[in-house]
């Protein structure tokens, strides 16, 4: 039995709750990928995964779906195959597209979710998703910035209004206030962002965000733990 060890920890009643739960994850990259896999390994029975992107060589340093063999493939397709290889009985809905306020019905019309995981990078899309979750009274947890960070022990779960240091959280906090949204559970880091180094020999004027294997992954696992605990009231 796949979930025998989990049942020993949380009990059969809670395991059944997870089996009958449907979670939708927006963004299956560095944070969302680890969150997704942890959710289904914990026993979530139905999952929807949303991501328009393909696996890139630059994802190899931190994303659970990134392998030499998956470069160039749709992230949702790679993730779906991986999840079903863990639990063949899992129900997976794949959305290889970008979420926006213009295609809300694709994800929310005639669908019910136990929880929403927001691992979106783009601020406008992030805000629109949070607004929809609040309008529909669906529990949601949002990932704040994990780039340019080195210390995973500085990550914590809190309400958006109690966050500090994180530049993304500052923007989200301000914009949610403008939208009249007072509460939002987030995972964020209290670590001051590092200034990214210039790559040797690079002529690019744009400075990309630095990242490492163990910070986004930890954020994803924290998100998964919060979802599981909330669904089971643990």
Across the structure, where does each feature detected by a protein language model lie?
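Conserved S-adenosyl-L-methionine
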Residues: 41-46, 135
């Amino acid at each position: 039995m796949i979930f025998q060890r989990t049942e020993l920890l949380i009990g059969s009643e809670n395991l059944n709750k997870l089996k009958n739960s449907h979670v939708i994850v927006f963004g299956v990259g560095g944070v969302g990928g680890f969150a997704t896999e942890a959710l289904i390994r914990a026993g979530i029975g139905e999952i929807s995964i949303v991501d328009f992107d393909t696996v890139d060589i630059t994802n190899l340093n931190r994303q659970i779906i990134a392998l030499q063999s998956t470069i160039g493939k749709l992230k949702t397709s790679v993730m779906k195959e991986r999840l079903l290889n863990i639990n063949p009985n899992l129900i997976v809905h794949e959305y290889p597209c970008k979420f926006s306020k213009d295609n809300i019905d694709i994800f929310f019309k005639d669908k019910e979710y136990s929880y929403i995981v927001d691992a979106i990078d783009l601020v406008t899309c992030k805000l629109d998703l949070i607004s929809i979750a609040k309008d529909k009274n669906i529990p949601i947890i949002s990932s704040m910035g994990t780039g340019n960070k080195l210390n995973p022990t500085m990550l914590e779960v809190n309400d958006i209004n109690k966050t500090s240091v994180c530049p993304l959280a500052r923007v989200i906090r301000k914009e949610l206030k403008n939208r009249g949204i007072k509460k939002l559970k987030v995972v964020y880091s209290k670590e001051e962002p590092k200034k990214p180094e210039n790559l040797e020999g690079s002529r690019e004027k744009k400075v990309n965000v630095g990242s490492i294997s163990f910070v986004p992954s930890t954020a994803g696992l924290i998100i998964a733990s919060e979802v599981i605990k909330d669904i089971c009231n643990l």
